[in-house]
């Protein structure tokens, strides 16, 4: 850690002296001009009620379009954090009709510092309900992750096409916020970086934008489906992209960009910015009656808890905040050496569309059922959980992916933060 920190410090100081951010400053000026354009929205605040012991304070944050004189966004912020005796930060809320509920838990774990941040926001924009959930896992310091918590979703809602073209808005906001962060740090010798895994729900349509190795999964009809793909340097497509830009992938305990950073995309990391971009990969889906829950988490969870286990654990608790706490405790008990932060979002769907089955009709059909097919789920409940995500081992075994030359060293580096 001392060696890598020294290398980063040396590189950052050299980069600051030669003025590598001239282009970034020019882009930032353009961003400021873009974000200063006003748009008037008719808005109302979504009401929430608390579902845990934490008291919730809601405040409306108004952003005013001075050219039109209308209120643009009325935003309900998350309440102040509350820490219990064990050092856990957590709580939860649900909307008025109970169709959506959310719980979160954040824990420093075995690390001496906390570099994980999260953000949860909800609002109504032009009559459209919007909810945003984000996990930001910092490396090399906490400044980048904290900056994303403070600015990413606010910047997103200011984008003129947030509602009409949400994918475009997410893509541009991620890249613009990255440039803005680098500009804000231009006079420092720090080289902080961060992941960002964000789930944005616009009405019933979900968008997941990911940069880095935090992850978002959804449970649909009992299946654990990954909605993001970890950005690792030895991912074949990422390796080709980095090498095409003139970068190198080196082994230093794990595969790293330039021998320094153990992820291929991130916010910040100015001296690797040519290779380590903040352009998100975005997936979207409709939240229908099969969608049961979302889990967003930092790699402190995913290092030791597979997608299928995460869904099973989250489903085992009725309240999402209890599910988030259970996931965090499980990761810690399984040996996670990292900060652990997760958000669980649960959906409740009305079942009115299901036909009512008469008792005598069920009795007549029972002899035709195969009893073995009914007993299978009870004999092994875990078989009901399937996954459509790509296993990490499968990714690394692709023909053009970089093989692990020292697999025996992996247990020693598990939980190690990227770039340290």
Curated annotation (Swiss-Prot):
Keywords: Hydrolase, Magnesium, Manganese, Metal-binding, Protein phosphatase. It comes from Arabidopsis thaliana (Mouse-ear cress). One of its GO terms (molecular function) is metal ion binding. One of its GO terms (cellular component) is plastid. Its cofactor is Mg(2+); Mn(2+). This is Probable protein phosphatase 2C 76. Mn(2+) 2 binds at residues 137, 299, 338. It comes from the Eukaryota. Residues 353-420 are annotated as: Disordered. Disulfide bonds: none annotated. Binds 2 magnesium or manganese ions per subunit. Its EC number is 3.1.3.16. The keyword Methyltransferase does not apply. Mn(2+) 1 binds at residues 137-138. Residues 403-420 have a biased composition (Basic and acidic residues). Belongs to the PP2C family. It holds the Pfam family PP2C. It catalyses: O-phospho-L-seryl-[protein] + H2O = L-seryl-[protein] + phosphate; O-phospho-L-threonyl-[protein] + H2O = L-threonyl-[protein] + phosphate. InterPro entries: PP2C, PP2C_BS, PPM-type-like_dom_sf, PPM-type_phosphatase-like_dom. Residues 101-347 form the PPM-type phosphatase domain.
